[in-house]
Design a protein with these regions (language model features):
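Transmembrane helix-boundary elements of multi-pass transport/secretion proteins
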Residues: 3-87, 98-116, 127-136, 166-169, ...
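Transmembrane helix segments
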Residues: 39-48, 160-201
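Short, membrane-interfacial amphipathic segments enriched in basic
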Residues: 1-12, 194-204
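Hydrophobic/aromatic residues in alpha-helical transmembrane segments
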Residues: 39-40, 70-74, 118, 122, ...
Length: 249
């Protein structure tokens, strides 16, 4: 097992070194969600509706923004790695699919850590939310798990694209169901049965279930099934990604 982990961390170190030189990618990953969250604040503030409980929406929307941007940026970067034949060279040098995928996931998870923290702090500050530290830490955990799953989805989807242009059709296919079928906008119960079934195939549904419980005064284990579904979902996607990863055609 030691050579396996050594190769995984070797991939992670290479990707981290590459990220250090890609200031544009880091800037987009960190600043774009900050800007979108501010627009979200302006939107809710402009509604000026005392009957609207913004607290029930802002964290699910924040988590969705992290999900969307993480998926898009990671997928594009990974396809670029394929175009430049970086993946091909790693496979030629003896790296296995799972080692490559875990290495990329570890490296990009460091960025997801900062991104999720920024979104959490900004939402709490702008909307003047007064949750306990334990609740905020739980919200952060859910957002971070969703970001990691988004990266796993991006790795999986990038396996079916040979250039950046081929990624774009996957963006609405993967991300839009999470907005409309997760309970973030309207309650799941009012959707048709087929839509309720379909909602279980998007990770945003499980994240939203847990976030709603947390912002309503509950704790992580009030929605334990949804919480445990997040790492399970990520595991399944990683397995699929490892089986479909290939070198450049």
């Amino acid at each position: 097992m030691e050579p396996f982990f050594r190769r995984v961390f070797s991939v992670a170190k290479r990707v981290l070194r590459q990220l250090q030189h890609d200031k544009r990618f880091i800037g987009l990953s960190l600043m774009v969600p900050v800007a979108i969250i501010y627009v979200l604040y302006v939107f809710f503030d402009s509604l000026n509706n005392p009957l609207l409980n913004a607290n029930a929406y802002v964290f699910p929307f924040g988590a969705y923004i992290v999900h969307f941007l993480t998926f898009v940026l990671t997928a594009i970067v990974l396809v670029r790695e394929r175009v430049t034949e970086t993946l091909t060279r790693m496979m030629v040098n003896g790296y296995q699919q799972l080692e490559i995928i875990l290495g990329y996931l570890i490296a990009y998870s460091t960025l997801a850590t900062g991104q999720s923290l920024l979104v959490l702090v900004e939402i709490t500050w702008l909307f003047k939310l007064d949750y306990s530290f334990a609740t905020l830490a739980s919200i952060y955990l859910v957002m971070w798990l969703l970001a990691v799953i988004s990266m796993a989805l991006a790795i999986f989807v990038s396996n079916f694209a040979n250039n950046e242009g081929q990624v774009f059709p996957f963006i609405p296919l993967v991300t839009l169901p999470g907005m409309f079928l997760s309970g973030m906008v309207i309650s799941i119960e009012v959707l048709p049965e087929w839509a309720q079934v379909l909602s279980r195939f998007t990770p945003v549904y499980y994240a939203t279930e847990v976030l709603h419980a947390l912002t309503s005064g509950g704790n992580l284990w009030d929605e334990s099934a949804a919480l445990l579904s997040l790492p399970a979902y990520g595991f399944v996607v990683l397995v699929l990604a490892s089986f479909t990863l290939r070198d450049n055609d």
